Amino acid sequence: SDFTGYALRTFVSPNGTLRTVIAGCASGPTQWERVDWSADTPPGTSVSLRVRTATTEADLAMARWVGPFRDRPSELELPPGPVSGERFAELELTLDSGGTMTSPRIDRLTVQYNCPL
């Protein structure tokens, strides 16, 4: 029998998350504009994004999540945003297999922001 196939269907999580912290403008407030990603999303799978911001990296743990954003690129100033203009942003990408035997894969993540004068 093929225990590998059984193990993949039985013991591997069908969903996953990827989190990363981005430091915005060194001078402080940051206008978070857009997040885009390149992904392989087989039929039935999906990728969504949540964002939270804080003045310090340590304060991110207590910040409120905004999202999920499902479109790419995700305009962070539009619903379900806007994302507040704090210096640090934490991005959380959720990869969902949708109950299929395949998973999405992220190839690239791009964050666009502006530093107000």
Describe each PLM feature range.
Residues S1-L117:
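Beta-strand-rich ligand- or partner-binding modules
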